Amino acid sequence: METTVSLVQMLDARERRVQHQQELLARYHKPLICFTMNICGPVKDSPLIRRGFARGRQLLRQQFLRAKLTPLYQDAVREVTGCEAFYVLDADPLTIKKFTTDIEDATPLGRLFDMDVIRPDGLKVDREELNLEGRRCLICGGPAKVCSSRRIHTVAELQEKTTEILTEARDAQDIADAARLAVRALLYEVTTTPKPGLVDRRNSGSHKDMDVFTFMDSAAALYPYFEACARTGRETAEQPAPETFAALRPLGCEAEGEMLDATGGVNTHKGAVFSVGIVCAALGRLDRSLWAEAARVLAEVSAMTAGLTEKDFAGVTAENAATVGQKLYIRYGITGVRGQVEAGLPTVLNIGLPVLEEGLAKGYDFDRVGGGALLAILANSTDTNIIARSSRERQLALTEELKALLVQTPYPDKDALAALDDRFIAENLSPGGSADLLALTWLLHFVTTEGNIDE
């Protein structure tokens, strides 16, 4: 519930803020940034406002990195009277003012940032010292001081515009981050080396028509698609979850075409177009605060695809089964990736992700961790690619063999993985379904560990 604040509360907060500034200046004798939000009206704190504030802090950190500056001191407070952050920097005040005004002027969201730069003597650095114009009005773009002094715009108008700016900035960041992490996951999957029978940096596995560069081309081509999936999720978030999934179908068809264009007709990521696209849409449907909960993200995947298996296999018989997936469903009841997403990707949640994160906690490198997660996934799921390239019997025997291996060595080293790779290639085996689940495992790892930007 949003809390309104009184004028007295705001004056008290301002007094405390000034006192804190004076304490920091007296302690460090260095310039100081005081960052607050320009929020009109009696509500100064909300989840949406905090998201905007977090984005502002992120942009400041990026400027510090660009300028090779490490704050001598930094802290942040969140009160009903608003968010505040303080940074003490050993740098020229005008240099600091230049990059804070760059942030303030770069985007509509920047208009809501108030990044004061205070000299060691306590005086603020003015924009005019950099020959910059004053701040612009949120609504009309005119001089903010003029509009404010004349009260040209009502509080309601300013609040509506503020909400619009904050919402658009939040959605744009969430959509871009979902797509970025999705592409990153695809790249981590293909570069994990060695991977038995799969394309990696060592070789092309059991494939003759693709290599690691083919996969990189494909992953890059899919970024706009993953953005579109996340955007669709956000735009349909208030609708029943299956409606979001239905809206993805035409996007997926278009993405397959982009993939084939990028690879010269090679199917590198058809499975990932389906499964990773669904996860991106699920992220779009969810508030960013829920990204840290893998089970919640995958529950959304399950809700979106409810009834998918029954619907897609309705009417399929032994006589008319045409695809590998249809034939395996009729003969063995294997539901493949449809069953995985409809169940909320249990192999990712219960096998891949725990193995990946435990390996990282042990300090193993990405190759060894990724290899261990891949084998655990392959040993605890039904990879239809393995069956298609051999038989159901070989797939079952392989899973038992891998389970025994993983009991002894949960994270096989490079030599052991390379030996497995050679064996898989000799048998023409390629666990492509497990590779897709490994990519999803990396994606969920990135989302849960890096998705929460609210410091």
Task: Report the location of each language-model feature.
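Long, contiguous binding/interaction regions
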Residues: M1-A67, R78, K98, D102-D171
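Long, hydrophobic/aromatic-enriched structural stretches that serve as scaffold segments
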Residues: A228-G284
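Short, structured motif recognition centered on aromatic/hydrophobic residues
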Residues: S275, G371-L378, L437-L444
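Short, conserved charged micro-motifs
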Residues: D45-S46, P93-T100, W291-R296
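Phosphate-rich cofactor/ligand-interacting catalytic cores and adjacent structured alpha/beta frameworks
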Residues: E164-A241, F245, L283-D422, T449, ...
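Short, well-structured hydrophobic secondary-structure segments
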Residues: L32-D92, M210-A237
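A short glycine/serine-rich beta->alpha loop
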Residues: G257-K270, A361-K362, D422-P431
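Short, amphipathic C-terminal "tail helix"
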Residues: A426, S430-I453
